[in-house]
């Protein structure tokens, strides 16, 4: 994969509440300098099968364009007791990246979502985990679950807290956009500034933007 190109593992298409078809989402990401992008539309038990449609769309793009595209899901606002079951079910439908909608401070996410996600090895990323606790961060580290620094308005208000604890406990931090609209995608330079704004030390920024997301992709044999 190229140097200083984006890897965004949390975006949405028309398969949930995003504005773009998967193909246009990927095309726009490619134009502004992405090496890889995951399409992780919202799911719960009512629509978990959408993972197979995302995978089908992604396969067409993978076969024809020079950008790594990954089918995924974001498990969103579900009873915490079914996170593990839904993660496994999403995998069976072709999802290669599993994000869970974490306890952002701007939505009424069910308490315990961060902890249950951290305990689930099938989960790759806890999206915008808000005021995640030290204990939850340690559990995430133990289970190789990454924590997200978010570029999305509102969700980003917890970035400083997530970065501080993540760095202290050695968590895998990744920076994603949670894109819903064309203007939500960002280039590498803006991602660098967002990471620094979360008080991530300059020497750690390349790990957050490149090394850590690549670890996730390598774990699943995607790259």
Kindly label every feature range from the protein language model.
Residues 12, 43-44, 74-76, 103-105, ...:
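Catalytic metal-binding/acid-base residues of hydrolase active sites
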Residues 10, 29, 41, 128, ...:
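Conserved, mostly hydrophobic/aromatic
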Residues 17-20, 48-52, 109-114, 136-143, ...:
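Histidine/acidic-residue-rich catalytic or RNA/ligand-binding cores of hydrolases
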Residues 42, 171-185:
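Short acidic/histidine-rich active-site segments
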Residues 193-223:
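Mid-to-C-terminal alpha-helical segments outside catalytic/metal-binding sites
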Residues 6-16, 39-43, 129:
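Histidine-centered catalytic micro-motifs
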Residues 48-149, 217-223:
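Extended substrate/RNA-proximal surfaces in nucleic-acid metabolism proteins
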Residues 27-37:
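Catalytic domains of carbohydrate-active enzymes, especially glycoside hydrolases
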């Amino acid at each position: 994969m190229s140097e200083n190109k984006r890897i965004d593992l949390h975006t949405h298409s028309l398969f949930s509440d995003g504005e773009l078809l998967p193909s246009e989402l990927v095309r726009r990401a490619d134009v502004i300098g992405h090496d890889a992008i995951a399409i992780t539309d919202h799911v719960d038990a009512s629509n978990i099968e959408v993972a197979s449609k995302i995978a089908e769309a992604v396969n067409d793009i993978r076969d024809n364009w020079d950008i790594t595209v990954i089918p995924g899901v974001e498990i969103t606002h579900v009873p915490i007791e079914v996170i593990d079951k839904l993660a496994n079910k999403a995998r069976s439908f072709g999802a290669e990246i599993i994000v869970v909608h974490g306890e952002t401070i701007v939505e009424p996410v069910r308490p315990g979502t961060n902890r249950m996600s951290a305990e689930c090895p099938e989960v790759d990323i806890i999206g915008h985990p808000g005021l995640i606790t030290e204990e939850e961060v340690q559990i995430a580290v133990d289970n190789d679950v990454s924590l997200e620094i978010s570029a999305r308005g509102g969700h980003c208000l917890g970035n400083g807290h997530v970065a501080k604890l993540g760095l202290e406990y050695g968590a895998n931090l990744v920076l994603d956009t949670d894109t819903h609209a064309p203007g939500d995608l960002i280039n590498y330079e803006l991602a660098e500034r967002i990471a620094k704004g979360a008080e991530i030390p300059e020497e750690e920024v390349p790990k957050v933007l490149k090394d850590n997301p690549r670890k996730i992709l390598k774990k699943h044999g995607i790259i």
